[in-house]
Amino acid sequence: EPRELPAAAGGILLFFLLFLAYSMLRPVRETMGIAGGVQNLQWLFTATFAASIGGQFLFGWVSSKVRRKAILPWTYGFFILNLAVFAALVLACPGNVWTARSFYVWLSVFNLLTVSVAWSVLSDVMKPGQMKRLFALVASGSSLGAMAGPAVTAALAGVAGLLWLFLAAAVLLALPMLAGMYLHRWCDGNSPEDAGT
């Protein structure tokens, strides 16, 4: 419906940019996993599982302490800072195996939490009927971002190193953070009667 166009566009943009950032980093993760030692991949899988469980518990605790509108900017802001730290580590200690291993585990937690937060924002700002109608449209943003990410990484890899890939991903992650904040403002500007069911 016409009144839902801003929300649909914001949702598509949110998921496109989020998955673009993730898909840019995924090839880096695989490379770093190998750099950390092929013989250690089994332990990296175990560490990834443990970190994902721990991250979920920590995220649940933090979410219970802050306003729902603040969850997305806090979560995405935290991961943007993480990317800045990885960029600094790559610059200061290039080729460090522990940086590689940490990033391998970190990206899985990043993907799990950022996607969960994105869907929670949509469930906050849209009614169930709207979610049913707009789900496929909004989800198309994730597919487009996932397709574009590796191409962007390949293009940047020829002219920029890991440092710039991390910084580019941090900038891209800041944009879906703004899109999520826009969706909350859109919701505030629409009464329950206007939002429909």
Where are the language model's segments positioned?
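Small-residue-mediated transmembrane helix hinge/kink sites in multi-pass secondary transporters
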Residues: 31, 60-64, 150-154
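Intracellular juxtamembrane helix-capping segments at the cytosolic ends
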Residues: 112-127
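Glycine-rich segments within core transmembrane alpha-helices of 12-TM secondary carriers
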Residues: 42-54, 132-157
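Helix-loop boundary and gating motifs at the non-cytosolic
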Residues: 2-54
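Conserved MFS/SLC helix-loop-helix module at the cytosolic interface between two early adjacent transmembrane helices
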Residues: 56-75
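Hydrophobic core of transmembrane alpha-helices in multi-pass small-molecule transporters
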Residues: 16, 20, 96-114
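Intracellular loop-helix junctions on the cytosolic face of multi-pass helical membrane proteins
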Residues: 1-12, 38, 65-70, 88-101, ...
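Hydrophobic alpha-helical segments of secondary membrane carriers
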Residues: 75, 137-141, 168
